[in-house]
Amino acid sequence: MNLDKEDRMPVVTVQMWTGRTQQQKRALVRAITDAMVQHAGAKPTNLHVIIQEVPKENWALAGVMGDERKD
């Protein structure tokens, strides 16, 4: 299917540890929206940003659970 630019519905998904404030998440969503408009030609009215917050105990990096990390 060939969609016109204005008909596309971009979705940006951000996965991050739980703990950011609502103000931080709002600022992040604004920055992502601005970047998608500027660099990807997205229309703000069509852009979806989904923030998935994951508890540290449900995330691992390099074989170490997030709630066990020291850095």
Language-model segments: which ranges?
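A domain-level signal for the structural core that forms small-molecule/cofactor-binding pockets
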Residues: 2-71
